């Protein structure tokens, strides 16, 4: 399991939201590329980027900041937010993004995921965001009647590289991830699951590592590394020690 730092972009700045609410944001950096370099220097292997404006608008909104991050880094990046069609996927991969995350469009149009996986093998990730176990879309503004597990099962056999699972009630709240829901999802499918939302202390990383065998390949952390609750290099060292045991 690896620890993945997150950069959430709003109006070209690096921010964190509470429970996905755009009005409850905290700006952590006016220079996202410089912030990305900090996380790379601390040992990150993969950077998670979210275009928050894009997620709400349904189209890319922070291309300049994203391109600056990609040009600055040597490590792999994965990007989500506002990716709704093959043309956008192709443009981002051409820019140098390592993997793209399809969220809302995956729920509404699973065929897009299948086609994207066929065209760009190993580079397509599905983002599933859930509130009380039910899938939320459109920048978390709309909760559907579909469970996270039922949606995830639709993508079995497509060649999806991973599923990023976010428990919205935990995101940005520093209350710890929903271990049970994450494990249940990972056990229900063969696709690797990346946990997101709520990681607030090294103990949370340890708790996820304890259920890693269920199929959990990574943990995304945002607010905790910006606030200093977690030292990213320590969290990375912890997972590397676990991998060598």
From Swiss-Prot:
GO terms under biological process: L-histidine biosynthetic process; L-tryptophan biosynthetic process
Subcellular location: Cytoplasm
UniProt record similarity statement: Belongs to the HisA/HisF family.
Protein name: 1-(5-phosphoribosyl)-5-[(5-phosphoribosylamino)methylideneamino] imidazole-4-carboxamide isomerase
CDD domains documented for this protein: HisA
PANTHER family (UniProt xref): 1-(5-PHOSPHORIBOSYL)-5-[(5-PHOSPHORIBOSYLAMINO)METHYLIDENEAMINO] IMIDAZOLE-4-CARBOXAMIDE ISOMERASE (PTHR43090:SF2)
Cellular component terms (Gene Ontology): cytoplasm
Enzyme Commission no: 5.3.1.16
Pathway: Amino-acid biosynthesis; L-histidine biosynthesis; L-histidine from 5-phospho-alpha-D-ribose 1-diphosphate: step 4/9
Active site: 8, 129
Gene this chain is encoded by: hisA
One Pfam family, short name: His_biosynth
Catalytic activity, as annotated: 1-(5-phospho-beta-D-ribosyl)-5-[(5-phospho-beta-D-ribosylamino)methylideneamino]imidazole-4-carboxamide = 5-[(5-phospho-1-deoxy-D-ribulos-1-ylimino)methylamino]-1-(5-phospho-beta-D-ribosyl)imidazole-4-carboxamide
Top class in the EC scheme: isomerase
Organism of derivation: Geotalea daltonii (strain DSM 22248 / JCM 15807 / FRC-32)
Keywords: Amino-acid biosynthesis, Cytoplasm, Histidine biosynthesis, Isomerase
Molecular-function GO terms, alphabetical: 1-(5-phosphoribosyl)-5-[(5-phosphoribosylamino)methylideneamino]imidazole-4-carboxamide isomerase activity
């Amino acid at each position: 399991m690896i620890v993945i730092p997150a950069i959430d972009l709003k109006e070209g700045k690096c921010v964190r939201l509470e429970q996905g609410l755009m009005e409850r944001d905290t700006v952590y950096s006016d220079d996202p590329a410089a912030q990305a370099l900090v996380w790379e220097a601390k040992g990150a292997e993969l950077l998670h980027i979210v275009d928050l404006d894009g997620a709400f608008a349904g189209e890319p909104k922070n291309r300049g900041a994203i391109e600056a991050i990609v040009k600055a880094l040597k490590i792999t990046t994965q990007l989500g937010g506002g990716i709704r069609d093959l043309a956008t996927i192709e443009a981002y991969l051409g820019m140098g993004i390592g993997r793209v995350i399809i969220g809302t469009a995956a729920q509404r149009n699973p065929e897009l995921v299948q086609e994207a996986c066929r065209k760009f093998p190993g580079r397509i990730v599905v983002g599933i965001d859930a509130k009380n176990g039910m899938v939320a879309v459109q920048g978390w503004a709309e909760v559907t009647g579909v469970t996270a597990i039922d949606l995830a099962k639709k993508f079995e056999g497509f060649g999806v590289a991973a599923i990023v699972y976010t428990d919205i009630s935990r995101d940005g709240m520093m209350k710890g991830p929903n271990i049970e829901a994450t494990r249940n999802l990972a056990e229900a499918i063969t696709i690797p699951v990346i946990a997101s939302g709520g990681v607030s202390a090294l103990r949370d990383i340890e708790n996820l590592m304890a259920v890693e065998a269920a199929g959990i390949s990574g943990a995304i952390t945002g607010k905790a590394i910006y606030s200093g609750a977690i030292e990213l290099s320590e969290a990375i060292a912890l997972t590397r020690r676990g991998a060598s045991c």
